[in-house]
Amino acid sequence: MSLLTHHHETEARRSTMLRTAFCPVVRRALEAPDTIEVMANPDGSVWIEKAGIGIVVSEHTLEASDRERVIRLVASGIAEAVGPHAPIVSAELPGSGERFEGLLPPVSTAPCFSIRKPATTPFELGDYVDQGALSPALCAALRDAARTRANILIAGGTSSGKTTFTNALLAEPTFDDDRIVILEDTRELRCAAPNTVQLRTHRGSVCLQQLVRSTLRLRPDRIIVGEVRGAEALDLLKAWNTGHPGGITTLHANSAYGALRRLEQLTLEATRRAPFDLIAEAIDVVVFMSRAGGQRRVEEALRVSGFDGESYVTEPLVSRSLSLVTQGDMT
């Protein structure tokens, strides 16, 4: 038996054991095609986010012992200790790759966890237009930005659709002829380009900043980072600005312009002064995603053209009249 076959069989067994440990309400929710995320709270309530609907509460609850068993089983599967001195478990579930976050006391009052399903049906930019989440003019402008190797920053709140939109951009044919290197904490991005390398951080040994630096030795044409959260932001900006344009990354922010200020804050984890000019030169386009209930849409897109000493010089990627959409039904 080859090592690869043995690994796949082990993953299959782990997946079966884990899903057996889930109570029926969690199993049914994960099996439902319209489920986006399942959340088990410390009080035992179970909340489910459904596509096009939003978050609803289940009529079923989970006992603390059941919630803790799930968390411990996930921790065991990734060979991590869990308990009062290590109460947080972050993992990718075996099999279908759901993103798992579990917490135990003392950081939570009782065991709780969240399971986010990966997108099973990839969306393309045209799908956003069809569902009223993106105007045709803005869609064309974003396609042109990707084609001309603009560096694109996608911002938004939690669960606003940043990853799904990144995947839609990566599905564009313009990426097919390039060598793409994708860096992530959890494997969520998909790129059909034939010359694609996907790398993932490893807790305690390999951080995102190290991966960005290592990537430069892999001869990338485009560098894609799932989400910047810290000092790696500075390394990525330098990479994009020194011969590796055409990248995409995401971060949490409350507006398109606010994403540039948030980027400043992240770079300050690696330097004493925010690199305003570097940010203005490296970031070409900022896309802001929003969510209201179960609806996600592209709320705003800016073109960045410089820094005037006090603020970033920006303008709408397309005129406001052309960027408006009548409805946002993107999930």
Give residue ranges: language-model regions.
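Walker A (P-loop) phosphate-binding loop of P-loop NTPases
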Residues: S159
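Conserved lysine of the Walker
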Residues: K162
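Hydrophobic anchor at the beta1->P-loop junction of P-loop NTPases
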Residues: I154-G156
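Switch/coupling sub-region of P-loop NTPases
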Residues: R149-I152, A168-A282, F288-R291
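P-loop NTP-binding catalytic core
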Residues: E49, I55-T148
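Conserved P-loop NTPase
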Residues: A280-T331
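Active-site phosphate-binding and catalytic loops of NTP-dependent enzymes
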Residues: F22-R28, V74-L93, D178, A270-F276
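N-terminal anchoring/assembly modules that precede and organize ATP-driven motor systems
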Residues: M1-V57
